[in-house]
Amino acid sequence: MECFVVPVSLIRYIVYMRFSELLLKMGLPFLSLLVSFVCNSSPTVSDRPNIIYVMADDLGWGDLGCYGQKRILTPHLDQMAFDGVRFTQVYAGSTVCAPSRSVLMTGLHAGHTRIRGNARIPLRPEDVTVAEVLKKEGYQTALIGKWGLGEPGTTGIPRKQGFDYFYGYLNQRHAHNYYPTHLWRNETKVALRNTVPDEDGVGGGVSNNKLDYSHDLIMDEALGYIHEHAEQPFFLYLALTIPHANNEARSQGMEVPELKAYAELDWPEPQKGHGA
C-alpha cells in the first residue's frame, strides 16, 4: 500500500493512499488524482478510513514546489509530498471542467461518461458516482466547492448523486466568480454580501463590492465538516476553483483578496493572482 501523509491539526492520525485501491476493492474502477485517507483513532488504517479528496482547477504538477517549481510558494502542498508519496503518473480525465469531474465521479473514460463538454448536461439517476458507492459502505458523504455536474431542479444535483451534504457552486460559470452574490447549501441559496452588477443567469460576472471571498467560506465549511465528522467514516470531496481565473474578469484574471508576496514582483497582474 502506498501512503501520502499531510498534517491536519483537527485529526490525530492521517494516512494517504491511492483512491483507486479502495474503489477497486469495492468493485468500481477509478482514475486517482490525489486523495487523503484520515484515520481518527488509530495509527493503523481501518477498514473504513476517512477520505478527503482535493481537486483544484487549473493546478498543474508544474505549479508545485515539490515537482521542482521555484517561483510560486506552495509550502503546505510541498509538505504533503515530503511526508508521503509524490505521484508521477496521474492524469485528469479531460482538459475542461465538467467532463473531468464526470470522469472523476463515475470512474468512466471520457469517451463513455455522459458529460463530455461544458454544455451544462446533468448526471442521470442511473449514473453511479463514487459518493454512492461509499455511502453504501457506511460513509457520510459531502461535496464542498465546485460541482458542475447538475444544476437546480435537475437529476444531477449533488444530493441526488450520493452526497449527503453540499456547499458551494453548482454551475461552472458561477464558480468563475470568487465574489458571487450567493453560494448553495444543499438546494438552498445562501446570500452573500457581494454585489455583481452584470450577473448572468447562473451567478457569473464580476463583483464591484467584494466583501465575501468564496474560497474563505468554502475552506471554513470544509474544516468545520472535518471537525464535526471526525469520529465517523466520511468522504469529503473538496473541489476548489482556485487557481482558475475568473473568465468574465478578462484581463484581471484571478480574483484574490490580496497578492501577498507577489504584489511587488515584476509579473503581469493575472500571474500575480495565480501565484497568490
Language-model-detected regions and their locations in the chain:
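Bacterial N-terminal signal peptides
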Residues: 25-36
